[in-house]
């Protein structure tokens, strides 16, 4: 089962292709208020123009623009006011030439009117109105279909629905939408040293931070999670994996994948008939990571070191799981850009290295003043507040503030 370490780009391609080849999740219909973050199961299109009529964006007077010619404070134009319109009204008649309609914000323009003069540029008259400014056609008018035209795609199939999507859909009269069923991911932390959070601490033991962090990250992305931890016993690990594979759509493990005497996961995967996608990635941290498919379900085996687990979760497991969940591939991959370092990093990088970081406004900060110690694979606290990874390519020397580096933003 031993294979050469896979290049990061090739590893990502393999898991994305494997995820794309899986059957799409079942479709369910959800009310809009429960659909935020869920993935559209078909293209959702505008049912009508929005706005559905020409409307006023302000309080004032709807007019024929030709009737305002020459109007100014020195030479006002006076017109009779023949109707009044509020938001929600439907004009009962067209606006005659040479007349004005009192109109409020959001109200539809009557037929014939082609502009709106704000009330501050009038005497605010009720029976007649003096106009203090001339207007051009379509001035101060929100045109029918100006926001979105009937038939336009609001959310393509595979799009995660945001509050903005849902607001636009509600404005189109949608009450419910078809979405893909949320996938359930099993989280298995392995290690006889692990305690569940809340258990009394004992010498030689540590708490299961990976399980909580991995489960929380997947929950943030809309996955349902089943979380467990077990001892370094190959029979127990195999039993737990079988159960999770039965009840879940995919599984993520942490720990037990390196070359230690109790690193049993590679052998357990082989026993379970795993088809390996890759066994090891040529990078730091997280090089021992494994990815496989068992009975049509993806399995990702991460390092037990907290940051190594976090980095490879973001780089490989999250994109593949989002793809399997029905997202379009382009929204699964970590967005890349170039930023300027505000802090340096003191080590050379023989292979590709990824550092947790905080990016904003074209700058990126490596926590811990860029010290190598703060970025050991076992360090967890430096991850707080980070929103990206800085990539230092193979062969890089130490980097200093002011240098340009490649940044990979976490996916949301």
Tell me the role of every PLM-derived stretch.
Residues 1-9, 177-302, 306-312:
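Helix-rich terminal scaffold detector
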Residues 1-73, 327-354:
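Short, low-complexity N-terminal leaders and the immediately following helix N-cap/first helix
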Residues 2-9, 13, 29, 33, ...:
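Electropositive phosphate-/nucleotide-binding environments in soluble metabolic enzymes
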Residues 2-3, 62-228, 373-374, 389, ...:
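Short, glycine/charged-enriched hinge/interface segments at domain edges or termini
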Residues 12, 16, 59, 119-120, ...:
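Predominant activation on well-ordered alpha-helical scaffold segments within soluble catalytic domains
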Residues 28-33, 37, 42, 88, ...:
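Flexible glycine/proline-rich
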């Amino acid at each position: 089962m031993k294979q050469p370490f896979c290049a990061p780009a090739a590893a990502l391609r393999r898991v994305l292709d494997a995820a794309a080849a899986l059957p799409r999740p079942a479709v369910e219909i959800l009310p809009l208020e429960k659909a935020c973050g869920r993935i559209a199961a078909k293209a959702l299109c505008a049912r009508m123009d929005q706005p559905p009529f020409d409307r006023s964006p302000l309080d004032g007077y709807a007019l024929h623009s030709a009737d305002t010619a020459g109007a100014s404070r020195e030479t006002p134009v006076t017109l009779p006011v023949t109707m009044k319109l509020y938001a929600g009204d439907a004009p009962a008649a067209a606006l005659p030439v040479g007349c004005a309609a009192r109109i409020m914000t959001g109200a539809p323009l009557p037929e014939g009117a082609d502009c709106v003069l704000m009330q501050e540029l009038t005497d605010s008259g009720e029976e007649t109105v003096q106009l203090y400014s001339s207007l051009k056609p379509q001035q101060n008018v929100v045109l029918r279909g100006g926001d979105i035209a009937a038939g336009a795609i609001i959310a393509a199939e595979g799009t995660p629905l945001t509050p903005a999507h849902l607001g636009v859909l509600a404005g189109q009269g949608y009450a419910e939408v078809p979405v893909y069923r949320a996938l359930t991911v099993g989280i298995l932390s392995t290690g006889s040293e692990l305690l569940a959070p809340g258990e009394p601490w004992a010498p030689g033991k540590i708490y299961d931070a990976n399980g909580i962090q991995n489960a929380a990250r997947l929950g943030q992305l809309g996955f349902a999670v089943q979380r467990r931890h077990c001892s370094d016993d190959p029979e127990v690990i195999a039993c737990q994996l079988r159960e999770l594979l039965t009840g879940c759509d995919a599984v993520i493990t942490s720990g037990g994948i390196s070359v230690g005497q109790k690193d049993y996961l590679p052998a357990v995967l082989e026993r379970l008939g795993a088809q390996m996608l890759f066994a090891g990635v040529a990078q730091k941290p997280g090089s021992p990571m494994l990815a496989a498919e068992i009975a049509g379900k993806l399995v990702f085996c991460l390092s037990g070191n907290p940051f190594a687990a976090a980095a490879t979760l973001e780089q490989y497991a999250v994109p593949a799981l989002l793809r399997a969940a029905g997202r379009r591939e382009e929204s699964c991959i970590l967005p890349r850009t170039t930023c300027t370092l505000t802090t340096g990093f003191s080590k050379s990088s023989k292979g590709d290295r990824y550092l947790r970081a905080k990016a904003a406004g074209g700058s990126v900060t490596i926590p811990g003043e860029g010290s190598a110690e703060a970025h050991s694979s076992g360090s967890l606290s430096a991850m707080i507040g980070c929103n990206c990874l800085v990539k230092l390519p193979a062969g890089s020397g130490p980097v200093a503030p002011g240098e340009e580096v490649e940044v990979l933003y976490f996916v949301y």
